[in-house]
């Protein structure tokens, strides 16, 4: 996993060049937005159980066959596994959001996840729908202006959304 700074240094080193002005500008913008980033990650982390529970409730309301006898989330053990997986994905989205880089999400969470779900018979489309529901809930919390650093969060919100999109695409 690389944070944004380490990634820029590694790329410049691989090119055998100094860090470019545009790379420095991009990192400077990230630093100037760091309080917003920390606020966003803190808000998602502090509301993780609510985000997961809300997404699960909505998912099971939309796809009741998942919790019906024979469904993939039927029995408390399977339901717990589903909620655990949603929480793990959300946790890695927060790591990527904090670092400003998706590599931790890709390398430690999503790599091989689709294959695992296929082997277990877990419907990837349902997992992707759950991830998208978590995205909606998390972004609503991030975009709530009450009690956070002043400023436009559109860019950060968009970035966080892409991490959820990567997760949904990886399992669909």
UniProtKB/Swiss-Prot annotation:
Positions of modified residues (N4-methylasparagine): 72
Protein modification: Contains two covalently linked bilin chromophores.
Compartments, record wording: Cellular thylakoid membrane
Record bears the keyword Nucleus: no
Membrane topology: Peripheral membrane protein
InterPro entries the UniProt entry points to: Globin-like_sf, Phycobilisome_asu/bsu, Phycobilisome_asu/bsu_sf, Phycocyanin_b
GO cellular component term, pick one: plasma membrane-derived thylakoid membrane
Superkingdom, taxonomy of origin: Bacteria
Keyword Transport: yes
UniProt-annotated binding residues for (2R,3E)-phycocyanobilin: 82
Predominant cellular place of this UniProt entry's protein: membrane
Swiss-Prot/TrEMBL keywords: Antenna complex, Bile pigment, Chromophore, Electron transport, Membrane, Methylation, Photosynthesis, Phycobilisome, Thylakoid, Transport
Database matches in SUPFAM superfamilies: Globin-like (SSF46458)
Gene3D superfamilies: Phycocyanins
Signal sequence bounds: none
Similarity comment text for this entry: Belongs to the phycobiliprotein family.
Matches recorded under PANTHER family: C-PHYCOCYANIN BETA SUBUNIT (PTHR34011:SF7), PHYCOBILISOME 32.1 KDA LINKER POLYPEPTIDE, PHYCOCYANIN-ASSOCIATED, ROD 2-RELATED (PTHR34011)
Subunit structure: Heterodimer of an alpha and a beta subunit, which further assembles into trimers and the trimers into hexamers.
NCBIfam families linked: phycocy_beta (TIGR01339)
Function as written in the Swiss-Prot or TrEMBL entry: Light-harvesting photosynthetic bile pigment-protein from the phycobiliprotein complex (phycobilisome, PBS). Phycocyanin is the major phycobiliprotein in the PBS rod.
Record protein name field: R-phycocyanin beta subunit
Gene name of the encoded protein: rpcB
């Amino acid at each position: 996993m690389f944070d944004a700074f380490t990634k820029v240094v590694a790329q410049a080193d691989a090119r055998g060049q100094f860090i470019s002005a545009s790379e420095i500008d991009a990192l400077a913008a990230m630093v100037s937005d760091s309080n917003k980033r920390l606020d966003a990650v803190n808000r998602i982390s502090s509301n993780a159980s609510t985000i997961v529970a809300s997404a699960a409730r909505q998912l099971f309301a939309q796809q009741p066959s998942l919790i019906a006898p024979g469904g993939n989330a039927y029995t408390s053990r399977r339901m717990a596994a589903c909620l655990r997986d949603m929480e793990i994905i959300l946790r890695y989205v927060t790591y990527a959001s904090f670092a400003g880089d998706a590599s931790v999400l890709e390398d430690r969470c999503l790599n091989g996840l689709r294959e695992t779900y296929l082997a277990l018979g877990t419907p990837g489309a349902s997992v992707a729908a759950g991830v998208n529901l978590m995205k909606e809930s998390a972004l609503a919390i991030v975009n709530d202006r009450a009690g956070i650093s002043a400023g436009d969060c559109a860019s950060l919100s968009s970035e966080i959304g892409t991490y959820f999109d990567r997760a949904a695409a990886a399992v669909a």
